[in-house]
Amino acid sequence: MEVEFNGKKVYFNGEINDIFDTHGPYCMEVEAIGEDDDGIEYSAIGTYDGEDITEIEEDTIECLG
C-alpha cells in the first residue's frame, strides 16, 4: 500500500511490528512499518488482512529516521 506523507510516497508492504487487536481471522489492527524511496522508515497504525496492509490511518504516520 502506498501513502503520501509530507510530499513523499511511503510504501507499507506488509511488514508488521505489532498486532494491537484482532477482529476475526482476516482483520487485524497493527503497527505497520514502511519506507520511502530514500530508505527512510516509517511507522503507522493500519489494518492487515493476513497478507496485505489494506488501510493506513494517515494521521498516525511517524518517521523513524
Language-model features, listed with the residues they occupy:
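Short glycine-aromatic motifs
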Residues: 5-12
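Acidic, low-complexity, intrinsically disordered interaction modules
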Residues: 13-60, 64-65
